[in-house]
């Protein structure tokens, strides 16, 4: 998955689309999302000279997880020490619950444009989120 994401990142950033930001939507277990985030630079203070993704919106686990790189998260307290998160290197990961019972609103702040030699024209400086409950049983 990492190799495919890297290839797509190169196409999206350097090809005809010239994307400033890439948001990956995954359906992985938390340890895999953490591994992907670390490998592809979906972390705070990422290197703008490297390809990769900027933010991961994850599913599959049916649990809420907020990566350690997320600056603030309103609406509830979440444990960033969940099993499978041990290797989280300040990731920009949001795993937003289960079966559309919960919803995350996400606000990202981008850097000023990087020099033309950078692969990532902009990087994420801050991520803020808000937890919303849609339904309760």
Protein language model regions, located:
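Cap/lid and interdomain-hinge subdomains that line or gate substrate/regulatory clefts
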Residues: 1-6, 125
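Active-site-adjacent helix-turn-beta-strand microarchitecture at beta-sheet edges
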Residues: 34-137
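Short acidic, glycine-rich surface-loop motifs adjacent to enzyme active sites
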Residues: 5-33
